[in-house]
Amino acid sequence: MSLKNDASSSHDGGSNRESVIDDHGRRKSTCGYCKSPARSSISHGLSAQTLTVYDYQALIDRGWRRSGTYLYKHEMDKTCCPPYTIRLKASDFVPTKEQQRVSRRLERFLDGKLDVQPREQRGASSSGDVSDTRRKTLGAAKSEENKKVEAVMDDLSKNIDQAVQLCIRSGEFPSNMQIPKASVKKVFCARRKKLAEGTEQILYTSNIAFPIAAAIKRIQTSEKEGINSAEGNRLSPETISEMLLSAMHKVGETPDVSIKVCKGHINFLSSAKDSFSDRDVVPNGNISRGANSLDGSETLHAKKDSENHQARKRKLEIHLKRSSFDPEEHELYKRYQLKVHNDKPGHVVESSYRRFLVDSPLIDVQPSGDEKVPPCGFGSFHQQYRIDGRLIAVGVVDILPKCLSSVYLFWDPDYAFLSLGKYSAIQEINWVIENQARCPSLQYYYLGYYIHSCSKMRYKAAYRPSELLCPLRFQWVPFEVARPMLDKKPYVILSDIAISHNQCSLLAGASETLVEPAASEHEDMEQGETNDNFMGCSDEDEDEDEDDDDDDDDDEEMYETESEDSHIESDPGSKDNDINNILIGLYGSQYRYKEMRQIITPVGRKQLEPMLQSYRKVVGAELSERMVYEIN
C-alpha cells in the first residue's frame, strides 16, 4: 500500500557519520513479564550517541533491540524470560481468516456499515439499535456474501498463478525464481475509482508484480553473470503486470470481469453493479474513504433506517513521517497508556515519551534514486492513522536496509473494536512488499521479541510463516520447528532442533545464516532499566478485544542455567577474545586498542579489558571494529 510521505523532508542524515556508543555492561533488573520480585532479567546495555542503519540492522540480527537511544540484549541462558527475535518474510505472508476479518471489519466501519460505537458513546440510548433478529439476519447474509467473494478471489489467484507459470515456461521470468503465491484482495470503498471507459469499476486487485520484481532483482544481483540481465533490467512492476495480463488472456477468459493494469497492480473490473462491490481500496494511493466527515459530537453508529439508506462514509489516511515530537501524538499516547495499560500519570509525561518513542540514535539516510534505498529513506518513523482527520493510532517503526522493524504501537482506546494492532501490522507487511521492488534488500518484517511463555505475545507467531533467531548460531529457524521445544522449556538452542529432527532442508530453505561461521551473533530483548514499565506488554500490543491463547502462563518456571561462568554468547569460532582491534573513541580521536595498550597503566588495563572482552562478545568482532567504543 502506498503511503503519503514527507519523511525525507526532515533530518540531514549524512551517510559519512559513524556509530558511537557508550557501554553500560551487564544489567540486572526486575522483569515486566513474569513479575518476579527478584532482579531476574539479565541483559547487556549500550547507549548509542549515533548509530548507522547498517550497524543497527547487524545488531538486531544478533538479537539486539533499541528503546529510544538505549540498546539492550538479554543473556538468553540466564535471564528469566528469554525473548527471541521474530520476523516474517513479507512476500511469503499468508493472512489467517482472523486477520482477513480484521481488515474487512475496518472497511465496514469506514463504510458506516459496522454496527458499533466507540466506548465513550456506548450505553446511551438503545432505541436506534438493530434488533437481535435483524442483526442475526444481516450477519447470515454478510457471511454468505463473504463466502462468494472469497471463492471469486480464490479463482482469480489461481488464474494469476497459471499466468506466472506460463511466463516462466516461455522464458520471460527466470526458472529458478522463488515464486510468491498470488494474493487477490477485495476492493472496498464508497467512492469508486472509475476508469476511462464506461462505468467499469474495480472489484478486486493484486500486487503480485511487486514481489516478482523483487525476486528477479535478487537473482540478478546474486548471480555474477545474471539471467537475462539486459531484459531483466526492464522488468519493473509495471512491465511485469503487463506481461501477466497478456499471459492471463492466453490462459483463458475470466468470466464477469475484465482485467486492466495500473502502476504495477492487476485490477479486475466489472461494468455490472455488484452487490459485493460497494466499497473501495484504491491501489497505489493512500487509503481514502469518504465523503461525509463526522464531527466529534456525532455518533459513529451506522444509520440503517429507511429514511437514510446511504451509509455515512469515513476517510482513512495513513501518513508516514520522520520521528519527531508531536503534541497530538503524545496526548494519544497518554490516553492509551493510562486506559489500556493502567500506567500512572507520572510515567507518561513528555520527557519519558520523548525518551521512549521519539529519540532515536539512527542516522537518517535520504532517498538517493537508486535501488538501495526506498523512496522514504532509512531511519526512524512515526506512521499515523487518521479517520476523518482524527488521530486514532501511531505506529513507531524503524526502516532499515533489510526490514521494517516494528517498535511500538499506541491507539485510541475508543477504537479498540477495530483491532488496530492487527490492522497496522498487515499494513506494514504490505508496505514492505510494495517497497521491495524498489529496494530489493528490503524483504522482512520484524515484530520485535517473542516470549513463548507470555500469552500476550502469541499473536506475533500468527503472522505466518514466521522465524525465530537461534541464540547460539544466529540462524533463522521456522517457528513451527521451534515450537515443540519451546513448549517444554523457555531457553532452547533453536538450530539444534532442526538438525536433531533431520530438518536441515527445511532450515536451509527458510533460514539465513547472518554471519560468517567465525563471527559471533546474538539475541534481543526489551529495555532492562529505564523502560521496565513498558516491558509488561509486547512491542505492538495485542488488542484488548482479542482473546489470548488458551494456554495460561503456567510455564513461567525458568530453565536452570549451568553456572554463572557459562556464557552461550562466546564466539564459537574464535579461540580467544582478541580485543586489539576494537575501535576506541577518546577525547575526539579514534584508536585501535592495541595502539593504546602501552600508554594505559596496569590498573587501567585491568579495569578496561574485561569490559572490552564482554563488549566484543555481545556485539561480535566485526561490529566491535567498526563502531566507536567511547571512553571519557
Swiss-Prot record:
Query: What is the deletion mutant like?
Result: Delayed leaf senescence phenotype. The double mutants ate1 and ate2 show reduced seed germination potential and inhibition of seedling establishment by sucrose. The double mutants ate1 and ate2 exhibit abnormal shoot and leaf development.
Tell me which UniProt keywords the record has, alphabetically. Acyltransferase, Plant defense, Transferase, Ubl conjugation pathway
**Gene Ontology molecular function, alphabetical:** arginyl-tRNA--protein transferase activity
Enzyme Commission number, as recorded: 2.3.2.8
Keyword Acyltransferase appears in the UniProt entry: yes
According to its UniProt record, this protein's enzyme class is transferase
Q: Where is this region: Disordered?
A: 1-27, 113-144, 284-312, 517-580
Pfam families listed in its UniProt record: ATE_C, ATE_N
Write out the catalysed reaction: an N-terminal L-alpha-aminoacyl-[protein] + L-arginyl-tRNA(Arg) = an N-terminal L-arginyl-L-aminoacyl-[protein] + tRNA(Arg) + H(+)
> Does the entry feature the keyword Transmembrane helix, yes or no?
no
Start-end of Basic and acidic residues biased regions: 113-122, 298-310, 564-578
Which residues fall in a compositionally biased region of kind Polar residues?
1-18, 285-296
Q: Name the Gene Ontology biological process terms.
A: defense response to fungus; leaf senescence; regulation of lipid catabolic process; regulation of seed germination; response to abscisic acid
Spell out the Acidic residues composition-biased ranges: 538-563
Q: Which InterPro entries match?
A: Acyl_CoA_acyltransferase, Arg-tRNA-P_Trfase_1_euk, N-end_Aminoacyl_Trfase, N-end_Aminoacyl_Trfase_C, N-end_Aminoacyl_Trfase_N
The job of this chain, per UniProt, is described as: Involved in the post-translational conjugation of arginine to the N-terminal aspartate or glutamate of a protein. This arginylation is required for degradation of the protein via the ubiquitin pathway. Component of the N-end rule pathway with ATE2 and PRT6. The N-end rule pathway regulates seed after-ripening, seedling sugar sensitivity, seedling lipid breakdown, and abscisic acid (ABA) sensitivity of germination. The end-rule pathway regulates various aspects of leaf and shoot development. Involved in the oxygen-dependent N-arginylation of RAP2-12, an activator of hypoxic gene expression.
Q: What protein family does this chain belong to? A: Belongs to the R-transferase family.
Q: What is this protein called?
A: Arginyl-tRNA--protein transferase 1
Give the species this sequence originates from.
Answer: Arabidopsis thaliana
